[in-house]
C-alpha cells in the first residue's frame, strides 16, 4: 500500500491550489487523486461560460489574483485574458500542476475511505489502496 502524509482528492482549483501551497511548504509525501484529468470539471463548462471574477495582472505589485491557485501566478498572465472560459481555466490548472511538478494520479477514482489509527485508508476503483495521515477532500 502506498503511504503519504497528505492525500488530496480532486484536481480542480481547490485541489491544485492546496497541493501547490503544500509544495511551497516543502511537503514531499503527498498525492492528488483525480478520477478524470486535471481541471476536468472546468473542461465540461459550456463554451460560452466564463469567470465572472476578472483575473488582473497585478501580481507584480504584490496583489493576488482571486482566480489564481498558486502564489505568484495569475490566469491573466498564463491565458492572456481577464475572464477565462472553463476550458482555458482547466489549461491554467494543468500549467500549474506541470510547472510545480505536483504528484497527481489521474484516472484514479476513490470508492471508499476508512478512518483508522494511522490516518485514512483510501480504496481506489482498481482495487488498490492508498494510505494518508491526512485527507483533504
Positions of predicted regions on the chain:
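Glycine-rich active-site loop/strand segments that organize a redox cofactor
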Residues: 37-90
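Feature captures the FAD/FMN-dependent oxidoreductase FAD-binding
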Residues: 75-137
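Short, glycine/charged-enriched secondary-structure capping and boundary segments
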Residues: 22-23, 45-49, 119
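N-terminal Rossmann-like FAD-binding beta1-loop-alpha1 element of flavoenzymes
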Residues: 2-32
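Glycine-rich nucleotide phosphate-binding loop and flanking beta-alpha elements
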Residues: 15, 39, 112
Amino acid at each position: 500500500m502506498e503511504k503519504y502524509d497528505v492525500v488530496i482528492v480532486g484536481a480542480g482549483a481547490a485541489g491544485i491550489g492546496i497541493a501547490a501551497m503544500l509544495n511551497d511548504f516543502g511537503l514531499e509525501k503527498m498525492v492528488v487523486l483525480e478520477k478524470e484529468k486535471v481541471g476536468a470539471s472546468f473542461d465540461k463548462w459550456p463554451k460560452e461560460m466564463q469567470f465572472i471574477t476578472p483575473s488582473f495582472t497585478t501580481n507584480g505589485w504584490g496583489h493576488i489574483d482571486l482566480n489564481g491557485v498558486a502564489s505568484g501566478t495569475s490566469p491573466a498572465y498564463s491565458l492572456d485574458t481577464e475572464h477565462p472560459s472553463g476550458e482555458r481555466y482547466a489549461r491554467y490548472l494543468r500549467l500549474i500542476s506541470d510547472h510545480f511538478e505536483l504528484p497527481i494520479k489521474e484516472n484514479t477514482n476513490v470508492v471508499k475511505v476508512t478512518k483508522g489509527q494511522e490516518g485514512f485508508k483510501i480504496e481506489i476503483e482498481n482495487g488498490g489502496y492508498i494510505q494518508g495521515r491526512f485527507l483533504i477532500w
